[in-house]
Amino acid sequence: MLVWLAEYLVKFYSGFNVFSYLTFRAIVSLLTALIISLWMGPHLIAYLQKLQIGQVVRNDGPESHFSKRGTPTMGGLMILFSITISVLMWAYPSNPYVWCVLFILIGYGIVGFIDDYRKVVRKDTKGLIARWKYFWQSIIALAAAFAMYSIGKDTPATELVVPFFKDIMPQLGLLYILLAYFVIVGTSNAVNLTDGLDGLAIMPTVFVAGGFALVAWATGNVNFAAYLHIPYLRHAGELVIVCTAIVGAGLGFLWFNTYPAQVFMGDVGSLALGGALGTIAVLLRQEFLLVIMGGVFVVETLSVILQVGSFKLRGQRIFRMAPIHHHYELKGWPEPRVIVRFWIISLMLVLIGLATLKVR
């Protein structure tokens, strides 16, 4: 909203014109979210400790996790608050793509909050019943998918971009809604599954959001979009502001979530961040790119699917424990080693994903 104020003030002082530059707003969006998160962290942690809102730890999990019992959770509230305030300050309020992401971020944040509340306040280890969680995730995702389809149905916004092939961009039509639904819900739950170690989920989220910031900038620039053979989407540029806000809020949260964590994000953070990343990927027409850059989330999810499927079909487990990060813990890897190695893999996958934009 400060952009509109700056457009008015530029009549009196030309220096306010700097607010119209996307690169400037991207930088200050990151810094704003980072500062808010760093400021809010100690206050939120102290408040959660006062309310005794602590993490519930599985009794069948790694023994090293027992010491985490009671660590404040629902720290994702600081992430959501930081992102929302930063985006509202620095993005154009008239941009429909921005509102689609915020709708998912806040909507999934509410679902996650209810789940966390039932777990840590009402001491219900199962939290929100799975079918109700999936129901509300579906309703919110479908509402966003219909909105996104209505915005872009007559533009390249409903084309499917296939990596490595510049001339293969099938028009999805109404199938766009179905694809958007699965990407949003799937990514939300994938990030949620990954959030099992200190800092494990937030850093890959930061990497992927940073990668999408570059993609959004290119997609919203007619010259670079043509150069990379990706659809030009005039609303896409403002998603840079959203992505950098996620990066800033994520780094601020990591300050308190790094090993040994002072706070966990909880479902209020993981479901919301995953949903936001999925929505950004759909809006940019880069669902396949999300699979590559978010490969850590994909592998974590597949490990759970394979583990459950193998046990039901053969009565045997593939991994010592799923998601796969627990498998490595039970193999004797120290938690920091698992975390940092997953970070390195995530960064590599983001760089590989960005490289595919040119390899066509």
From Swiss-Prot:
<dbReference type="GO" id="GO:0051301">
    <property type="term" value="P:cell division"/>
</dbReference>
<dbReference type="GO" id="GO:0008360">
    <property type="term" value="P:regulation of cell shape"/>
</dbReference>
<feature type="transmembrane region" description="Helical">
    <location>
        <begin position="26"/>
        <end position="46"/>
    </location>
</feature>
<keyword id="KW-0479">Metal-binding</keyword>
<feature type="transmembrane region" description="Helical">
    <location>
        <begin position="263"/>
        <end position="283"/>
    </location>
</feature>
<keyword id="KW-0961">Cell wall biogenesis/degradation</keyword>
<feature type="transmembrane region" description="Helical">
    <location>
        <begin position="236"/>
        <end position="256"/>
    </location>
</feature>
<dbReference type="Pfam" id="PF00953">
    <property type="entry name" value="Glycos_transf_4"/>
</dbReference>
<dbReference type="GO" id="GO:0005886">
    <property type="term" value="C:plasma membrane"/>
</dbReference>
<keyword id="KW-1133">Transmembrane helix</keyword>
<keyword id="KW-0131">Cell cycle</keyword>
<keyword id="KW-0133">Cell shape</keyword>
<keyword id="KW-0808">Transferase</keyword>
<keyword id="KW-1003">Cell membrane</keyword>
<dbReference type="InterPro" id="IPR003524">
    <property type="entry name" value="PNAcMuramoyl-5peptid_Trfase"/>
</dbReference>
<dbReference type="GO" id="GO:0051992">
    <property type="term" value="F:UDP-N-acetylmuramoyl-L-alanyl-D-glutamyl-meso-2,6-diaminopimelyl-D-alanyl-D-alanine:undecaprenyl-phosphate transferase activity"/>
</dbReference>
<feature type="transmembrane region" description="Helical">
    <location>
        <begin position="338"/>
        <end position="358"/>
    </location>
</feature>
<keyword id="KW-0472">Membrane</keyword>
<comment type="function">
    <text>Catalyzes the initial step of the lipid cycle reactions in the biosynthesis of the cell wall peptidoglycan: transfers peptidoglycan precursor phospho-MurNAc-pentapeptide from UDP-MurNAc-pentapeptide onto the lipid carrier undecaprenyl phosphate, yielding undecaprenyl-pyrophosphoryl-MurNAc-pentapeptide, known as lipid I.</text>
</comment>
<dbReference type="GO" id="GO:0071555">
    <property type="term" value="P:cell wall organization"/>
</dbReference>
<keyword id="KW-0132">Cell division</keyword>
<dbReference type="GO" id="GO:0046872">
    <property type="term" value="F:metal ion binding"/>
</dbReference>
<dbReference type="GO" id="GO:0008963">
    <property type="term" value="F:phospho-N-acetylmuramoyl-pentapeptide-transferase activity"/>
</dbReference>
<feature type="transmembrane region" description="Helical">
    <location>
        <begin position="94"/>
        <end position="114"/>
    </location>
</feature>
<dbReference type="InterPro" id="IPR018480">
    <property type="entry name" value="PNAcMuramoyl-5peptid_Trfase_CS"/>
</dbReference>
<comment type="similarity">
    <text>Belongs to the glycosyltransferase 4 family. MraY subfamily.</text>
</comment>
<feature type="transmembrane region" description="Helical">
    <location>
        <begin position="168"/>
        <end position="188"/>
    </location>
</feature>
<keyword id="KW-0460">Magnesium</keyword>
<feature type="transmembrane region" description="Helical">
    <location>
        <begin position="72"/>
        <end position="92"/>
    </location>
</feature>
<protein>
    <recommendedName>
        <fullName>Phospho-N-acetylmuramoyl-pentapeptide-transferase</fullName>
        <ecNumber>2.7.8.13</ecNumber>
    </recommendedName>
</protein>
<feature type="transmembrane region" description="Helical">
    <location>
        <begin position="288"/>
        <end position="308"/>
    </location>
</feature>
<dbReference type="Pfam" id="PF10555">
    <property type="entry name" value="MraY_sig1"/>
</dbReference>
<feature type="transmembrane region" description="Helical">
    <location>
        <begin position="132"/>
        <end position="152"/>
    </location>
</feature>
<keyword id="KW-0812">Transmembrane</keyword>
<keyword id="KW-0573">Peptidoglycan synthesis</keyword>
<dbReference type="GO" id="GO:0009252">
    <property type="term" value="P:peptidoglycan biosynthetic process"/>
</dbReference>
<comment type="pathway">
    <text>Cell wall biogenesis; peptidoglycan biosynthesis.</text>
</comment>
<keyword id="KW-0997">Cell inner membrane</keyword>
<dbReference type="InterPro" id="IPR000715">
    <property type="entry name" value="Glycosyl_transferase_4"/>
</dbReference>
<feature type="transmembrane region" description="Helical">
    <location>
        <begin position="199"/>
        <end position="219"/>
    </location>
</feature>
